[in-house]
């Protein structure tokens, strides 16, 4: 995507979208306990970047969640040929590239906007980092959200 695109301001058009997340808490708790067991046995080691005690502590805190339901709201906002994808969390860079390449507009991803609701990384990255281990947002939810954002932008382009 060329960074030399000229921004041309024009009409303001936006869509507000939502996505509901209701994880299976029994499954989530089993995964957390398995992660704790794997850390203690040495089977899971993220190296020096994340101390084992911190990761175990994070998982133990998450085990206290008996219920987790999340209704996310996010937006696609156009001002002329400038498009903002506004999201209340951290989307993996892979998703930002997908959203930017889905439009001919100058696209900006605004993360941590209107709140922070965990990390939304590609499903293949789940369980590999501090951001996804213990995350109550199930693997694969980010892909569904990004598909909604891209589809919304494409509808706005018509």
Q: Which positions does each model-derived feature cover?
A:
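Non-catalytic substrate/cofactor recognition surfaces at enzyme active-site rims
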Residues: 1-158
